[in-house]
């Protein structure tokens, strides 16, 4: 009897170990000897016309190698800086695997409460999950110009390229839905890292995979990530929603890749582990343009 209980205990331990992923970060996500790292600039933006009354915190990472004179590529993050991106980007710039790039991260907007200023109203799902050009307008017309109005501690100007081929956007969960919505609706970003994208019934982003099926392909390169333990709520199944998007991308002939990780949870460390490879994929062949997709199927109307 004791032997059977021991075997049952060991089996349970093995199952639990298999269910918990331990993500090992590569050297690309760690500080390296001989690589110069840049600085963060923190600011608050509260002058939005696109989203009136909102305030948000902005975090800009400027690599040490940036000269303050040449327009730099830009990567825009939702929900603040993540993925150990500052370290990864400086490492990959140093190894000449990606171009000079400035990182711009902003928190979702908050609106100060009329009756209780200490309890602001969160604007996140309204801004991120709504499939419209509005957040893209905010990024292009307000956020990026605001970033360019700032300077580094050494007095260097921040000059961001206006070429869509030099722009990337990323996020996790609703931030990933936002990244897709911005790239799709503005056509001013050509590289997207989407992790655990909320392509579900929060505010309509579940329609995005259908749009990919129906519309002419756009010159955007995508990297998708999700996991078998991603969210599953009354708004939908994140795992299957991301699979549907990948199927749509394949149908339409996009240049994309994906990583669906067994047992990965919603926005866990898997998204950080994959970020260096995502950057390599999204920026491969630069300064060449992201290729225009070749539709695999002809639709007769």
What residue spans do the PLM features occupy?
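Glutamine-centric residue-chemistry signal
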Residues: 3, 18-20
């Amino acid at each position: 009897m004791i032997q059977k209980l021991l075997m049952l205990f060991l089996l349970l331990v093995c199952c639990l170990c298999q269910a918990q992923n331990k993500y090992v970060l590569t050297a690309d996500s760690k500080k390296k000897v001989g690589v110069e790292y840049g600085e963060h600039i923190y600011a608050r933006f509260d002058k939005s016309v696109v989203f009136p009354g909102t305030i948000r915190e902005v975090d800009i990472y400027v690599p040490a190698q940036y000269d303050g004179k040449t327009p730099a590529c830009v990567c825009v993050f939702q929900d603040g800086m993540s993925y150990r991106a500052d370290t990864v980007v400086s490492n990959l710039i140093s190894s000449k695997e990606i171009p000079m790039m400035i990182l711009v991260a902003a928190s979702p907007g908050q609106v100060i409460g009329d009756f209780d200023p200490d309890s602001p109203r969160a604007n996140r799902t309204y801004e991120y999950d709504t499939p419209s050009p509005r957040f893209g307008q905010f990024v292009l017309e307000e956020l990026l110009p605001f970033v360019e109005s700032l300077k580094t501690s050494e007095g260097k100007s921040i000059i961001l390229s206006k070429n869509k081929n030099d722009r990337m956007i990323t996020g996790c969960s609703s931030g990933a839905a936002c990244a897709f919505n911005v790239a799709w609706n503005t056509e001013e970003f050509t590289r997207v890292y989407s992790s655990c994208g909320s392509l579900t019934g929060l505010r309509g982003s579940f329609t995005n995979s259908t749009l990919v099926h129906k519309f002419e392909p756009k010159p955007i390169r995508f990297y998708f990530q999700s996991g078998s333990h991603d969210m599953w709520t009354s708004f939908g199944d994140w795992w299957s929603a991301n699979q549907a998007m990948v199927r749509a991308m394949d149908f339409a002939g996009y240049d994309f890749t994906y990583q669906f990780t067994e047992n990965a949870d919603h926005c866990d460390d898997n998204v950080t582990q994959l970020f260096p490879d995502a950057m390599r994929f999204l920026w491969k062949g630069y300064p060449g343009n992201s290729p225009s997709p070749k539709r695999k199927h002809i639709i007769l109307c």
